[in-house]
Amino acid sequence: MEGPASSKPLKDKTNPWGPLIILGILIRAGVSVQLDSPHQVSNVTWRVTNLMTGQTANATSLLGTMTEAFPKLYFDLCDLMGDDWDETGLGCRTPGGRKRARTFDFYVCPGHTVPTGCGGPREGYCGKWGCETTGQAYWKPSSSWDLISLKRGNTPKDQGPCYDSSVSSGVLGATPGGRCNPLVLEFTDAGRKASWDAPKVWGLRLYRSTGTDPVTRFSLTRQVLDIGPRVPIGSNPVTTDQLPLSRPVQTMPPRPLQPPPPGAASIVPETAPPPQQPGAGDRLLNLVDGAYQALNLTNPDKIQECWLCLVSGPPYYEGVVVLGTYFNHTIALKEKCCFYADHTGLVRDSMAKLRKRLTQRQKLFESSRGWFEGSSNRSPWFTTLISAIMGSLIILLLLLILLIWTLYS
């Protein structure tokens, strides 16, 4: 009988370059993140869309950074209701319908994060009470985690019929398009920190004392466009001189054209030494000093107590930080490129004081660490050696235990 065929060993299909490829991708991603400056200005467009009709309620574009481009968005409630909303006659087709919409409270429920029991699009994500996170109602709905707040604008309720000024220009209180239900959308702190890579949806319902509250849905989208091709930024000519200045060249006195008469003292004309070129530190300090002079002439009230800072990364903006309770800017910039200024001028000792504080912090940090952590940071091979020795000892101990168990068994 023919025996079974001998099985061939499986070929290792592991790519030997796999770890290196993954490491390269991670390094490239890390470099791209570091080069992405938070001060980069882009063209940011926010768009509010009525998902029931597909019409745009608001489209606001502005130039700003990704951390600051969060404007207030203004639109009208009728942009979300439409001309005919439900079978009861609610809608914004007529001036009377627009005026009637002003008498209702409304509440908003998030569709990007739907809590349990809040339903789906049909219920406007407001399937039960407690799902609402914002709105304009007598119970003042609010939330600490939602991304936006939506409130009514400043139009008084006694404005009168909402006539279109292009049709009824002689009617008191007429507005362009008959818009008399202004809404104001603002971003919360959570909204400023959230990711807006995809549209986010909310449901809005009018509150009625009887019957079912009508539903509409809207989305909020952010579109980011580059303001133009990025020109490669070379080295700053101000900071090219990074090496210490060389010693001044010894100037030799000019040789007299004719020898002096016997017994007369030789007269050597005095020559002025060549002017020394300012170093990189002096040039950077002159930039900050120039910014201070410009501020002192244009807005002297802004420099009563302020920090002038140079940002080290592109696009090389020069920032003016005014002291206040807004944010600890010196900690954010690691206190390495800030100079204190007031009406007396730029304090040139600020950098030395900051370096001293940084040195003290570093010493305090090193003193608070244990001896093992400090040794491992100073000598990376020490950690590798300890790990190898400990691993060998553990293996020997296991083998010894196994040998003793075998002998006694």
Curated annotation (Swiss-Prot):
Superkingdom: Viruses
Signal peptide: 1-32
Membrane topology designation: Single-pass type I membrane protein
GO biological process: fusion of virus membrane with host plasma membrane; symbiont entry into host cell; virion attachment to host cell
Region (Disordered): 232-280
Presence of the UniProt keyword Transmembrane helix in the record: yes
Biological role: This envelope-like membrane glycoprotein is responsible for ligand-independent activation of the erythropoietin receptor EPOR leading to the abnormally rapid proliferation of erythroid precursor cells. In the first stage of Friend disease, constitutive activation of EPOR by gp55 causes uncontrolled, polyclonal proliferation of infected erythroblasts, leading to polycythemia (massive increase in the number of mature red cells). Host susceptibility to SSFV-induced erythroblastosis depends on the expression of the truncated isoform of MST1R receptor tyrosine kinase (MST1R isoform sf-Stk).
Protein name from the UniProt record: Glycoprotein 55
Source organism of this protein record: Friend spleen focus-forming virus (strain Lilly-Steeves)
Gene that this sequence comes from: env
